[in-house]
Amino acid sequence: MDKIVLEGCRFYGYHGAYKEEQTLGQIFLVDLELSVDLQAASLSSQLTDTVHYGMVFDSVRQLVEGEKFILIDGLAGAICEQLFNEFPPIEAIKVAIKKENPPIAGHYKAVGIELERQR
């Protein structure tokens, strides 16, 4: 299956189980892998034959920056649901969401989740 990839999308949001996360907010890193049949687009080179990744980015940004979730698992599920609803050609989605600086003690590069959904 062909893929459209958006990697390292950075958004500021207020998601998390800790009160500090819900009031102060933080940066969220979102990676998306969209399974889409790109055969027609590869032959026509027309935007109408594919999923516009700029529109995907805007859709995800509106959700991450405009809503609040206690768990990023819920945010990831909502991203999948919204993208399936807005972009019918998407057959499957892999989404990873990471927090670089959650309010937990320790040394790490990031914490996060990854999930995959199919129509």
From Swiss-Prot:
GO cellular component: cytoplasm
GO molecular function: dihydroneopterin aldolase activity
EC numbers: 4.1.2.25
Pathway in which the depicted protein is active: Cofactor biosynthesis; tetrahydrofolate biosynthesis; 2-amino-4-hydroxy-6-hydroxymethyl-7,8-dihydropteridine diphosphate from 7,8-dihydroneopterin triphosphate: step 3/4
Keyword Lyase assigned: yes
Listed SUPFAM superfamilies: Tetrahydrobiopterin biosynthesis enzymes-like
UniProt keyword terms in alphabetical order: Folate biosynthesis, Lyase
Gene Ontology annotations of biological process type: folic acid biosynthetic process; tetrahydrofolate biosynthetic process
Binding site for substrate: 21, 53, 72-73
Residues of the active site: 99 (proton donor/acceptor)
Catalytic activity line of the entry: 7,8-dihydroneopterin = 6-hydroxymethyl-7,8-dihydropterin + glycolaldehyde
CDD domains according to UniProt: DHNA_DHNTPE
Family from the record: Belongs to the DHNA family.
PANTHER family per UniProt: DIHYDRONEOPTERIN ALDOLASE 1-RELATED
Function, in words: Catalyzes the conversion of 7,8-dihydroneopterin to 6-hydroxymethyl-7,8-dihydropterin.
Name of the protein described by the UniProt record: Dihydroneopterin aldolase
Lineage of source species: Bacteria, Bacillati, Bacillota, Bacilli, Lactobacillales
